[in-house]
């Protein structure tokens, strides 16, 4: 039966239903109205649908769908809709963007992606962010000329930062806004690189790296025991008794500091106070004026190798192979008056020292297998944690957690306030010499020649990084983009996880 025949039959059926002399759409007696029964109406609609073309069925479907499903974004104010969307994760938001043009427009709102970015706890370079906002506020070009202009070229901010077209979206007036969706995507790729071990590795000591022509050295040829860096400089200490100051981006050695008569085993710096502090196997601690490249003070007191040193706003804290840690006043008028406390109690070498200004507590790690916490004001021992089965070689303390590494081949995470063991990580095949952590990850280095990346919250090992000479790893530091580590073979290695990514804002 063709569609025309279907149509004739339906018309006949409707005519029969409505030709009854007693039929009235307003009849108070339901039984006298054939269409008052829902089943009859359903049958009629089925017959009507069967008589329609495909296009007609689609039109009816769309109408019925609109009756069954209500788009909440058309009912609620836009601010409420955005609040609802803010509870979704990245994958769900991307799926929602495919639902309709209206949802796509709403979900390109930068506020949602900014909230997601912040919920992740991801780093934002506040200086660059403020520079962008300062530049944005001073430009009031009309749309579309300004928008088209920005889409075609990079922009230099007031302090020299280059901003790229993909970093912007535009409001209804054509003014640029920061594209938080783009920033989220770039940082998500960066996190994925960390989890899956995607990186580029290079070295500060690579012969392909050019050094300034007026320098008679290229890099240290002896073991490098310690490194520390920020956005501008890196400082390293080595067996050749020197402290090297590098430009962290060009990888040029800017200068060397001479003063120790033994290997430089540890160092720390405070840019706010323009202070660099180093500890040595000659048992001394030197405070350097690194801009004038000379020692300011030399502290004597330890009777063996100085293995750890921390500088804060008011104190220097050091640890030594002589079984003690010491607290030194930075504002002392003479080195003889500088020693504030000698922290005694460990039964073996104190290999690492940490300090948190938030809690006022010092944490020491020793070859006697214990961690100890101390009050910096009184010098009293607050807690002893029997942490490992063998000596502890390294530790970090952030005010809430202590993470330690040992020759028992484990990394352990402790709650600092109670000493409770939270998690134990296994994977290294030799002594764990250095460990660092943040809220998301732990990075460790050991005598097995590896650097390992772990999930702080689950203990899962993400990846293992090797150096070309399989050399012992002595020290490391990391940020959100890279790891820098030093080794027994004199190499300073850099693993970059941000290759090909736009990290302008983080």
From Swiss-Prot:
GO CC annotations on file: cytosol; SCF ubiquitin ligase complex
Gene Ontology molecular function: ubiquitin-like ligase-substrate adaptor activity
Keywords annotated in UniProt: Cytoplasm, Meiosis, Repeat, WD repeat
Function description: Has a role in meiosis.
The protein's name in its UniProt record: F-box/WD repeat-containing protein pof11
Localization per record: Cytoplasm
One GO process term, biological-process aspect: meiotic cell cycle
Organism listed in the record: Schizosaccharomyces pombe (strain 972 / ATCC 24843) (Fission yeast)
Xref: Gene3D superfamilies: 1.20.1280.50, YVTN repeat-like/Quinoprotein amine dehydrogenase
Summary of subunit composition and partner proteins: Interacts with skp1.
Stretches forming WD repeats: 219-256, 259-298, 301-338, 345-386, 388-426, 427-464, 468-505
Cytoplasm found in the keyword field: yes
Lineage of the species this protein comes from: Eukaryota, Fungi, Dikarya, Ascomycota, Taphrinomycotina
Domain F-box: 70-116
A Pfam family recorded for this sequence: F-box-like
């Amino acid at each position: 039966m063709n569609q025309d025949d279907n149509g004739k039959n339906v018309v006949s059926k409707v005519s029969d239903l409505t030709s009854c002399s007693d039929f009235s759409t307003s009849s108070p007696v339901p039984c006298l109205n054939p269409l008052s029964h829902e089943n009859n109406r359903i049958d009629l609609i089925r017959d009507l649908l069967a008589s329609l073309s495909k296009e007609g069925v689609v039109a009816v479907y769309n109408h019925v769908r609109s009756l069954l499903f209500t788009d909440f974004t058309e009912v609620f104010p836009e601010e409420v809709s955005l609040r609802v969307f803010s509870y979704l994760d990245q994958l769900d938001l991307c799926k929602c963007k495919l639902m309709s043009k209206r949802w796509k427009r709403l979900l390109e709102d930068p506020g949602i992606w900014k909230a997601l970015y912040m919920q992740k706890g991801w780093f934002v370079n506040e200086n660059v962010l403020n520079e962008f906002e300062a530049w944005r506020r001073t430009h009031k070009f009309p749309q579309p000329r300004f928008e088209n202009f920005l889409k075609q070229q990079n922009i230099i901010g007031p302090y020299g930062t280059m901003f790229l077209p993909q970093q912007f979206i535009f409001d209804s007036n054509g003014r640029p806004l920061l594209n938080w969706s783009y920033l989220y995507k770039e940082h998500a790729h960066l996190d994925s690189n960390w989890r899956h071990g995607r990186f580029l590795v290079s070295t500060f000591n690579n012969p392909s790296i050019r050094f300034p022509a007026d320098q008679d050295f290229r890099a240290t040829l002896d073991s490098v025991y310690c490194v520390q860096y920020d956005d501008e400089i890196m400082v390293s200490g080595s067996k050749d008794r020197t402290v090297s100051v590098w430009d962290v981006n060009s990888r040029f050695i800017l200068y060397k500091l001479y003063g120790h008569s033994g290997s430089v085993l540890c160092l720390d710096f405070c840019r706010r106070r323009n202070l660099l502090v180093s500890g040595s196997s000659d048992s001394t601690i030197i405070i350097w004026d690194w801009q004038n490249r000379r020692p300011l003070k030399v502290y004597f007191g330890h009777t063996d190798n100085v293995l750890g040193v921390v500088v804060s706003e008011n104190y220097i804290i050091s640890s030594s192979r002589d079984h003690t840690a010491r607290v030194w006043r930075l504002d002392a008028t003479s080195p003889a008056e500088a020693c504030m406390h000698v922290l005694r109690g460990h039964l073996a070498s104190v290999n690492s020292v940490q300090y948190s200004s938030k809690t006022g507590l010092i944490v020491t790690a020793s070859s006697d297998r214990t961690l100890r916490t101390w009050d910096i004001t009184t010098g009293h021992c607050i807690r002893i944690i029997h942490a490992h089965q063998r000596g502890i070689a390294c530790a970090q303390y952030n005010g809430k957690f202590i993470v330690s590494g040992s020759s028992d081949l484990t990394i352990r995470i402790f709650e600092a306030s109670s000493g409770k063991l939270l998690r134990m990580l296994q994977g290294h095949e030799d002594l764990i010499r250095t460990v660092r952590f943040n809220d998301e990850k732990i990075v460790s280095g050991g005598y097995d020649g590896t650097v390992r990346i772990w999930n702080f919250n689950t203990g899962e090992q993400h990846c293992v990084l090797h150096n070309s000479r399989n050399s012992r790893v002595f020290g490391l530091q990391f940020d959100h983009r890279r790891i820098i580590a030093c080794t027994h073979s004199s190499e300073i290695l850099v693993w970059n996880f941000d290759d090909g990514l736009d990290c302008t804002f983080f």
